[in-house]
């Protein structure tokens, strides 16, 4: 019996919650192959790649989320973090500003802008 996409997603999220990001990427990559247009899977995979410091892969996943959901404030913030880790502060700041505009109550978004301005 094969695992459902949802069970793979849940397994990946559980691994993330336990601090096992590398294991999370395995389950989440399988889920992504089945449903590549599912933003929740792509976001969780981006988080997993970010936690294992695979900045390029994290960037790619957060960009995919934004293609699927352009107004996802967290995806803009997370993409900014991945870009910042790659030394692309100006590009990161643009995404922090978008995230902060979309969700002005999220102080941590505004803090990243102040840190880079």
Locations of regions flagged by a protein language model:
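Alpha-helical segment of the N-proximal tetratricopeptide repeat
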Residues: 2-34
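Structural marker of alpha-solenoid helical repeat scaffolds
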Residues: 34, 68, 85, 101-102
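Structural signature of tandem alpha-helical TPR/SEL1-like repeats
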Residues: 18-30, 52-64, 86-98
